[in-house]
């Protein structure tokens, strides 16, 4: 893990694919290696690594958690904003608001969401429940083969989630997922193979 050079918040790793989807095209030449995402609301830094820092003004995408005015995107896959959630919560309650808006139900987060993750962390920060999920008991690393683009990554991520895994990290050659203790790990391999790629398991 690395800490943001401006606010010292611990960042989480994001793929070059994610960074490239949100940073302005003129800055693509600076995208080298993995970056880290800073989630602190008041910090202007979005992505950073040892060599490069990208701030809000250098992105073409609004980073909802860092915006002070609407629209404040929360679920990028289903185009759900903070305002939409709050309005639905006022009428139907927070739990129903998540269901009605479809927040947290997307499958392309690694590309659409600047954080490179599902928006569940953002929903929880706003006080919305993301219940119904089982707590993961173990973390598993999956070696991947045959992926060549962000479309491949998104397809494998969706397949793993359909198999019941919580995808923590994913790239062209590996994925790290969390699953229940009783989960059949071979089903994860089968899910990747069903999406048209090769995989093998390595417990962490």
Swiss-Prot record:
Ranges where the HMA domain occurs: 138-200
Record: residues binding Zn(2+): 4, 7, 38, 43
CC cofactor: [2Fe-2S] cluster
Binding-site positions, [2Fe-2S] cluster: 75, 77, 109, 119
Keywords: 4Fe-4S, Chaperone, Copper, Cytoplasm, Iron, Iron-sulfur, Metal-binding, Zinc
InterPro entries, A to Z: BFD-like_2Fe2S-bd_dom_sf (IPR041854), Heavy-metal-associated_CS (IPR017969), HMA_dom (IPR006121), HMA_dom_sf (IPR036163), Znf_CopZ (IPR040890)
Binding site for Cu cation: 149, 152
Domain of life: Archaea
Gene3D superfamilies according to UniProt: 2.20.25.270, 3.30.70.100, BFD-like [2Fe-2S]-binding domain (1.10.10.1100)
Effect of residue 119 to S: Alters iron-sulfur binding
A GO MF term: 4 iron, 4 sulfur cluster binding
Coiled coil ranges: none
Subcellular location: Cytoplasm
Cofactor note: Binds 1 [2Fe-2S] cluster per subunit.
SUPFAM superfamilies xrefs: HMA, heavy metal-associated domain (SSF55008)
Cellular-component GO terms for this entry: cytoplasm
Function in brief: Chaperone that serves for the intracellular sequestration and transport of Cu(+). Delivers Cu(+) directly to the transmembrane transport sites of copper-exporting P-type ATPase A (CopA). Probably has a redox function due to the presence of a 2Fe-2S cluster and could reduce Cu(2+) to Cu(+).
Quaternary organization: Homodimer or homooligomer in the presence of copper ions. Monomer in the absence of copper. Interacts with CopA probably in its Cu(+)-bound form.
Protein name: Copper chaperone CopZ
């Amino acid at each position: 893990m690395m800490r943001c050079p401006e606010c010292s918040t611990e960042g989480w790793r994001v793929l070059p694919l994610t960074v490239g989807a949100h940073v302005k095209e003129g800055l693509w030449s600076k995208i080298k290696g993995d970056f880290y995402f800073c989630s602190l609301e008041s910090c202007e830094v979005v992505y950073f690594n040892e060599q490069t820092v990208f701030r809000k003004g250098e992105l073409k995408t609004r980073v909802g958690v860092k915006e002070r005015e609407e629209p404040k995107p929360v679920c990028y896959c289903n185009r759900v904003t903070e305002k939409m959630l709050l309005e639905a919560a006022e009428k139907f309650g927070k739990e129903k608001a998540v269901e009605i808006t479809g927040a947290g139900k997307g499958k392309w987060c690694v590309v659409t969401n600047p954080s490179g993750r599902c928006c569940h962390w953002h929903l929880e920060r706003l006080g919305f429940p993301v219940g119904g999920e089982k707590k993961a008991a173990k973390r598993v690393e999956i070696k991947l083969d045959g992926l060549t683009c962000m479309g491949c990554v998104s397809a494998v991520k969706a397949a793993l989630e359909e198999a019941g895994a919580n995808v923590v990290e994913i790239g062209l050659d590996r994925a790290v997922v969390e699953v229940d203790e009783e989960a059949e790990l071979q089903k994860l391999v089968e899910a990747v193979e069903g999406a048209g790629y090769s995989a093998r398991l390595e417990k962490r």
